[in-house]
Amino acid sequence: SIVFSHEIKTVIVELNGMDFVSEDMTYGNQMIWIPEIDEEVVASGSVQGFIARYKKGDYPDIEKGFDSKDQRWSHLPNLSWYFDEPAFIYLSHGNGYVRLSYQSQVSIQEMIQYTSGRQLKIVIQKNQ
């Protein structure tokens, strides 16, 4: 018989600042340290990322958009055609961190501005 047992943790962080941006502005990344992603998660678990659809200032009520219970979330990877310069964001992970990578054929500048100040929800599944 097969027995499934797992633990799920959710971590929410605010995105601010890039750790690396290429000179031509077509690639960049952010490293976010998440100690809950341990060796067991890397070996046999999973990590998913979701970016908040709203941030402070998106509504007339400036506080709206910070309540994670009412928030809408977009699953990563995410391709946005909304901007003049379409960009792609994807999530990778390793022991103790996630890396959010941005790519565009033209420029990631608009996507950096879009994500700045937004929340990133990380869902970590540890198999036991």
Named regions from a protein language model:
Residues 2-48:
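Extracellular receptor-binding modules and their adjoining Ser/Thr/Gly/Asp/Asn-rich linkers
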Residues 4-6, 42, 82, 93, ...:
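A generic structural signal for short, non-catalytic loop/turn and secondary-structure boundary residues
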Residues 23-27, 90-97:
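Short, ordered beta-strand-loop transition motifs
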Residues 94-128:
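C-terminal partner/receptor-binding element of secreted or periplasmic proteins
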